[in-house]
Amino acid sequence: MLCCYPVKTLIARIPYRTLGVLPLIFFLAQAVYYWRTNQLGHMLWMCNAGNLIMALGLFFEKPALVRLAAIWTLPGLVVWFVYVVLAWGVFLTSTLAHVGGIAVALIALKRYRMDRAAWRYAFGWYLLLQLISRFVTPPAFNVNLAHSVASGWERTFQSYWSFWLVLTAVTAVTLWVAGMILWSIFRPRPAAELVVREV
């Protein structure tokens, strides 16, 4: 199949596929850390799983995967800074997963751009991973807030499901905003520009 592509096209593809190695390294570094501390359940947090999704999207050239992972890097970075950095400090593997993850996402979007509807896939991915987290992770970890009300919000919400409904609505709005921000920066290129680039 390689002979069917122009040399210029092949060269252009190599860097972005190779870029997938970085989020894979970030994911594996976190996996090693949590394996050593016997906390592998934490690998299902959105940002950790997002690095794996980003790597797969880059390796297999799947724009939808790249975009949904990229959208999650924005709220993920904020949540990580507030609830991890300010509370526990900076850790190498965690920093790579979040700061490195958003850096790779921004580079990847230079090629794959952003779709205005991509936030819906990011939201669907969140619901799926939260459901999986509820069944396969220890309740004590409360991964993706799938088991109980977030610490500090117990007085505001009398039940987990009222908390979940608000959380889900806020998450949907946040992902929409993140998607629109990235779309405003990485709008799809006009068809005429794409033709010029391919020539």
Question: Where do the PLM segments sit?
Answer:
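Membrane-interface helix caps and helix-loop-helix hairpins in membrane proteins
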Residues: 32-40, 83-92, 111-112
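Membrane-interface transmembrane-helix boundary segments in multi-pass integral membrane proteins
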Residues: 139-178
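Aromatic-anchored segments of alpha-helical transmembrane domains
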Residues: 24-32, 73-84, 124-135
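N-terminal membrane topogenic signal
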Residues: 4-22
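Hydrophobic transmembrane alpha-helices
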Residues: 24-51
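Membrane-embedded alpha-helical segments of multi-pass membrane proteins
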Residues: 43-56, 93-103
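Cytoplasmic-side transmembrane-helix entry/capping segments in multi-pass membrane proteins
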Residues: 66-74, 94-96
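Alpha-helical transmembrane segments in multipass membrane proteins, preferentially the mid-helix core
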Residues: 100-119, 130
